[in-house]
Amino acid sequence: MVLQNLKFHHIGIAVSDFEKIASYYYSIGYKKFNKSIIRDELQVVDLILLIHDFHPNIELVKPLNERSPINNYLKSSDVAIYHFCYEVDSFSDVIKEL
């Protein structure tokens, strides 16, 4: 079964303010994986991947402007769980099994 071999990679968290949220994660031992912010024009977001020696990786996802679909997650709060990401050997095999 393909689904039994899923490997957890990170939690995606939608945020309205990188500095405010990232400072909390830095205070509990998280570090930036990349030196710079990653821009994703397709999703209309900026991304920061945070890593920790013992805790799950976290991807902070911030909308670039009002057209970003991420804004829907931030209507009632400045922070919201956006997604869970898993590593797979074959995306098409996972889709078939679902």
Model-inferred region functions:
Residues K7-I11, A80-Y82:
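Short amphipathic alpha-helical segments
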Residues E59-V61:
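Intrinsic, low-complexity N-terminal interaction/targeting segments
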Residues L3-L6, I13-N57, D93-L98:
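Core segments of cupin and vicinal oxygen chelate
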Residues P63-E66:
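Short glycine-enriched loops at secondary-structure junctions
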Residues P69, Y73-L98:
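Mid-chain, well-packed structural core segment of small domains
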Residues M1-V2, L49, N71-S76:
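Short, flexible, solvent-exposed loop/turn segments with mixed acidic/basic and small polar residues
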